[in-house]
Amino acid sequence: TNSQINSYQEILEDLTNTFPMKRLLQGDVGSGKTVVAAIAVYAVVKSGFQVAFMAPTEVLAEQHLKSISEFLKYSDIDIYFLSSSVKDRDNVMESISTGKPGLYIGTHALIQEKVLFSNLGLVIIDEQQRFGVDQRKKLITDSDIVPDQLVMTATPIPRTTALSIYGDLDISSINELPPGRKEIISYLFNGLKGDSNLVFDKCKEHLNQNSQIFVVCPYIDESENSDIQAAEI
């Protein structure tokens, strides 16, 4: 889309500057933020540097691993995955410490004390609002050089609000959906037990249309302190 093109052009221009990039990339789920990030990854790794891509959960990190691996499958870029459950963790750690150029995708495992990047050119943080300030800074401050920073969020943030909260970041927005991508419709229920049938009816309606549905609940188990419906119920 045009907004994707504008976004990656802004990022590539930042990467050529003599000072580090600090940019926020925002766009709805499905708007194509990951492919824009993949373009930045390609540019930085082909320049001989490492890229650290941190996501808040292992599930989300694995999704990025799958998506970016598909985008870059015809390139010669090495892609590594680091989490607490990775079997070849020692090999990944060695590649990190020796400065081997490549993309390193992971969770909080990327900011553990033993993880020391020696050739870090770009840090990408997805859903950055789910990380603490100290966690976000750790990747940058532990590096031998000051890397470029790209943070991504699917949370809609008005530009004036974004400037007040992230005043030190330039902002790129993807406000168009790729061709063929359906608009995502959100429904909000009070969460009381009486809403269950309404939720189930809405799920049946979309399942009959062969649609995907995400149901988000505030609790996994029932809480004694609240009458809100739990996910397991």
Where are these regions (language model features)?
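Inter-lobe coupling/hinge segments of SF2-like helicase ATPases
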Residues: T1, Q9, T16-I233
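Short, conserved phosphate/pyrophosphate- and ester-handling motifs at nucleotide-, phospho-/glycolipid
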Residues: Q4
